Amino acid sequence: MSLTIPVIREPGFDHAPWFNGIIHGASAEARRRGVVCRVRECAADELPGLRFDDIESHIRPVILVGSSVEWLSNVKSLCADVSLRPILAGNCMDEGLFFPISTVSVNRSHAIMRLTGELYDSGRRNFALVGSLPDSFTDIHRRELFASVLKSFGLYREDAFYDQTDGLAECLTRFGKDVEKYDTVFFTNDIIALCFAPRAAAMGIAIPRDLVPVGFGNLPLSAAMLPQLISFSLDFVQIGRTSLKTALELSRHPEQLSCKIELACGICRGSDVCISAAGFDAEEMAYDDREYGALCYIDRLFSAGDRLSLDILRGLNEELTYSEIAERLFLSDSALRYRIRNIFSGLGAVSRADARRLTGRYLTLGIHNLC
């Protein structure tokens, strides 16, 4: 009988690139090794009562994927069952020293220190961090790490942190009012950076000359968008794969209660692409949650390697007719229209014009070469 490894996921992160990448990696590694990977959602208040009596194994590894402070605080309740081997994927926990909880995380500190040093040497002195969620353990840890690095360079300032206390739109609006005070901004993910950069250009801010945007790691997406960001290359799929491998190792060695694994974090350097405010009018300067959701969907296409959908999206933005797109991609009309319906649904678009409005100002013409 195949070993069954549960993956317990926190609700509410369906569109988060890091979240989907970890689960995709764990599922792919499970298929490769002939293991059953069973994903289920579990809210924070359900964790203490979670049972795995249906798994017929003396040692039962469990992969946990979540981010909120409340959810992670309740993870330690699973340690009451001595047969369980909880593995926290994508986050580290100081409490892991006191509870048998394994962690598979990314060591960002060295990469942040190195990049900040390079930007400092190039004359950058005014840094901001934008987009942190106040109830996210990951963002709290990242905020503390970023503050520590800035203090080491003598650049720390209390007002340089723009959190999503009142939502992303309000967060970006507040930063937009202060943007001229900064020459470098670290965004908590690349998608927020991509949403803000063209609006900064519309305000007359030259990117990257006046403002260097840095994102926290959706590498394939960043290389295909305008601007091509400096980004921390966090391989979320690899975190998922490593978590599954860790689960198998713990099941084979019952004497080992937990372990801590840190993956390396690299720096992806985008080219100095000058972007313009073309296509923006006064009404479109407002931040649109649909736009953020559309970029998350494109990120999922990249993560899944869905080259066909990306090529269709490229054709739509090139203003090709449906017949021309079908001919280019060797698709029947019915197959193309089926794909387009799925793309519109994923983007949250109601029409072709709406899809272009949501994505056209970001996608470069070379995205088909990146899959």
Specify the residue positions occupied by each region the protein language model found:
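Alpha-helical recognition/docking segments in bacterial nutrient-uptake
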Residues: M1-G117, F175-E180
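Short beta-strand elements in bilobed, periplasmic/extracellular small-molecule ligand-binding domains
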Residues: E29-A44, L129, A147-A169
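Flexible loop/turn connectors
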Residues: R33, P100-I101, G176-F187, I191-A278
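Hydrophobic alpha-helical segments within soluble ligand-binding/sensing domains
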Residues: M93, S102-V130, G167-T173, A193, ...
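An alpha-beta-alpha
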Residues: M113-F153, C259-I275
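Linker/hinge segments immediately adjacent to helix-turn-helix/homeobox DNA-binding domains
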Residues: K245-A304, S323, L365-C371
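Helix-turn-helix DNA-binding segment
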Residues: Y292-A335, R361-T364
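Basic, Lys/Arg-enriched C-terminal extension of HTH/homeodomain DNA-binding domains
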Residues: R341-C371
